[in-house]
Structure formats: structure tokens, C-alpha cells
Amino acid sequence: MRIHCLGGGLVGSFVTRKLVDAGFNVHLYDIVERETKAEFHLASALDSDHSDADIIVNMVPGSIGHEVVDRMKNKGQRIIDLSFSEQTPDRFENIDSAVLWDVGIAPGLSNMLVALASRKYGKLDKVTIKVGGNPSQ
């Protein structure tokens, strides 16, 4: 599976590293040079060609994150949006792409993992999600 990670900052570098460590074919796009095990592209996430990606993980700053999704929403892509945006998901009606909108690490991704565990293992009596700190430490 070919995954394009857009943005290699605090969250982006963490997510990219975890995906590489899990054995995925990961390409990291950023406008700042980054040290990474992924195949690195010094390029704008907005202007790069992502047509060969199976999944796009949008982790650019929220101030431009909505622009990335808006440009890709009609290209038949599968997009996971981890950038915080003040835009609402109603703009994703009648589009050609699948968008998991404003997922975030926690509570977004963590809640999806709890739901997956519940489906796999049955009723969960208790779930604790601890949030905070630097994910790279």
C-alpha cells in the first residue's frame, strides 16, 4: 500500500515514522527538509501529484489543511484528514473521494481504534485514553 503523508511536522513526523515502521510504502511531502525513513519529497503538498497514492494522510497546518482536501476531494482519492480545520464536513457532499474528516490523533484516531477493538473483542468494560505531550518522545 502506497501512502502519501502530507506535512512532516510534530504530528506528521510521528505518523510517518509509525507507518514506515509498520512496513508501508510511505512518501512524505513537506516544504521543509526532513530527516525520515520514508521516501522524502521536498515539495508543496498542494502542488504535488498524489494520483498514485492508495491513501493520503493530510497533516499540514490547519490554516491550509482545508485547501489540500478541497483540491483532492474530486480526484477519487482516499483521504484521512488529521489537520484541524474550522471548515465543516458538509462541503464533502457529492464528491468523488472518501474523506475521513478532521480525524486528529486523539480523540479522533484513538476513538476509531476503541471502536475497532470493541467490534473485534466485544463489549469493553473500560477504556482509558491518555492525551498530551510530544508524540515524538
Where does each model-flagged region fall?
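Conserved N-terminal Rossmann-fold NAD(P)-binding element of oxidoreductases
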Residues: 3-7
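Hydrophobic/small residue at the entry helix of a nucleotide-binding pocket
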Residues: 11
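Aromatic pocket-lining residues of Rossmann-like dinucleotide-binding sites
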Residues: 19
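NAD(P)-binding Rossmann-fold cofactor-contacting core
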Residues: 24-37
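Beta-loop-alpha module in the N-terminal Rossmann-like domain of NAD(P)-dependent dehydrogenases
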Residues: 55-71, 87
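A short helix->loop->beta-strand "cap" motif at the edges of active sites that frequently abuts
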Residues: 74-77, 97
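Rossmann-fold NAD(P)-binding glycine/threonine-rich loop
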Residues: 82-101
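Conserved anion/nucleotide-ligand pocket segment
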Residues: 116-137
